Amino acid sequence: MEKVESFKLDHTKVKAPFVRKCSVLDGVKGDKVTKFDLRFLQPNVESFGTAAMHGLEHLLATYLRDTLDGVIDLSPMGCRTGFYLILWGDVDAKTVKIGLEEALKKVLESDKMPAATAIECGNYRDLSLFGAKEYAKDVLDKGFSLNIYGE
């Protein structure tokens, strides 16, 4: 059985926060899709609270579509230390870093949580705008690196 790409990453050596280009996949018709690791918190040291992470997911899923072209999906990591971002095309990590930082600035300006109703969300009661803003501010203050080892 082939090991999942993210399981090959030595989580004890990385230094969050960072933006990591994980892979570029080639479709059968020549299209490309790029997967990114948007790591906000240090693995095995910190983790998001669920309401804050869920809120940040809603906000970033909305704002990243304004700041980056070709967004397919933003998904929370099960370990609750960051998100996976999937984009059409072969996209540069620096472009994603800039778009992510712009989206996080929009999070700080937000006064309403998008898709916060039972119709729009499967767990709408577990959303925290306050918590999402706290994490956004913290990660912007620290700054995202393009070097996963923090050098």
UniProtKB/Swiss-Prot annotation:
A Pfam match: LuxS
Swiss-Prot/TrEMBL keywords: Autoinducer synthesis, Iron, Lyase, Metal-binding, Quorum sensing
Catalysed reaction equations from the record: S-(5-deoxy-D-ribos-5-yl)-L-homocysteine = (S)-4,5-dihydroxypentane-2,3-dione + L-homocysteine
The protein's Enzyme Commission number: 4.4.1.21
Cofactor(s) named in the record: Fe cation
GO molecular function: iron ion binding; S-ribosylhomocysteine lyase activity
Annotated binding of Fe cation, by residue: 54, 58, 121
Entry's cofactor comment: Binds 1 Fe cation per subunit.
Residue ranges crossing the lipid bilayer per the database entry: none
Keyword Iron: yes
InterPro entries in UniProt: LuxS_sf, Metalloenz_LuxS/M16, S-ribosylhomocysteinase
Listed GO biological process terms: quorum sensing
PANTHER family xref list: S-RIBOSYLHOMOCYSTEINE LYASE
HAMAP family: LuxS
Assembly description: Homodimer.
Protein task: Involved in the synthesis of autoinducer 2 (AI-2) which is secreted by bacteria and is used to communicate both the cell density and the metabolic potential of the environment. The regulation of gene expression in response to changes in cell density is called quorum sensing. Catalyzes the transformation of S-ribosylhomocysteine (RHC) to homocysteine (HC) and 4,5-dihydroxy-2,3-pentadione (DPD).
Family statement: Belongs to the LuxS family.
Protein name as catalogued: S-ribosylhomocysteine lyase
